[in-house]
Amino acid sequence: RYEMTDVTVNGTQAPITGLTILDQTEMLAGFGDAQSIATESDYDVLLPNFSVRLEITDDLIARGAASSTITRPTLNSMSPVTVITTTRQGGDLTSTSGNPALEPFKSDNLDLSLEYYYDEASYASIGYFRKLVSNFIVNSQEDKTFELADGSLLTDPSTGTNASAPDAGDDVAVFTNTLPNNGEDATVDGFELALQHTFDNGFGVLANGTIVDSDAELDPFDINQVFALTGLSDSYNLVAFYETDDYQIRLAYNWRDEFVQSLTQGQGDGPTIVESYQQLDISGSYSVTDNVEIFFEGINLTEEFVHKRGRFSNHLLLVEDSGRRWAFGVRGNF
């Protein structure tokens, strides 16, 4: 598949007109009338997709797939507007911007699997996956100046001969501007294992696990690190079930290792890490008729807590107690 994308981004920006000394530490930014902004960009991508299925025997099947996929940037990250965030005396000037020229990040994927069906409803499988991801979007910082209506550059009135008022010796106001940019690459690979065994009397068990690795993991000792993959962790699930034509009940245990949720925090610097977590759930249903079903769900039966921390294990950020939750209902299909 070949895709061509034209991007038009519209926004409204009130231009900064000057900085005024407010008190001993702060300055106040003045703004003019809002003006419309429009930017245009384009990009094209080739997205091949190839898959193959090989029946080695009646019970043994091999599968393979190679593909390229893209993930487009969010609309918020493509905003053409610059927001002034800090105007303190002494050169502490910061701002944030979107980037209308952002391109999607691309993933070249390889998936291989081998499945063995040793009974009518029982199988074991192993799979390998590898993803080469390029053009990741990360936040970067650059110096930014602002041009005024008369063509001159905005100055910082706290830097001249008179630190309390504007004068001829004032320096150009240089803001540290944070904005998203393309550029980072990463490799992710891992294995997926699965086993399902069904007994003759309707009982069965299901187990699966994922082992994942990456070359873009968080280094807790590198405070200048600006890129690491989020959401990656090992996990496994164990399910016991009983099924008949009318009844179905499942007891599921889920475990997930700790993972980086975000490279930022709601307050303060540093990453947000979700610690390893386990949960036990139950669900069941009864078919009253071919079209009506009664069901129930029990979530987090053992009332586990979610713990979020910062860079190190003693940097507690949040303990989330969602409790045990039950749901009952009726489903209809007409």
Model-based region annotation:
Residues M4-T39, M78-G98, S140-L179, E217-A228, ...:
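Solvent-exposed loop segments that connect transmembrane elements
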Residues R130-L132, I137, E142-Q265, T302:
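Gram-negative outer-membrane beta-barrel transporters
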Residues D59-A62, A121-A124, G202-V205, D246-R250, ...:
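Repeated loop/turn-to-beta-strand initiation elements of outer-membrane beta-barrel proteins
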Residues S41, I70-S125, K131-V133, V172-F191, ...:
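Outer-membrane beta-barrel signature, preferentially recognizing the C-terminal barrel domain
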Residues R1-E55, S107, L195, G202-T210:
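Surface-exposed extracellular loop regions of Gram-negative outer-membrane beta-barrel proteins
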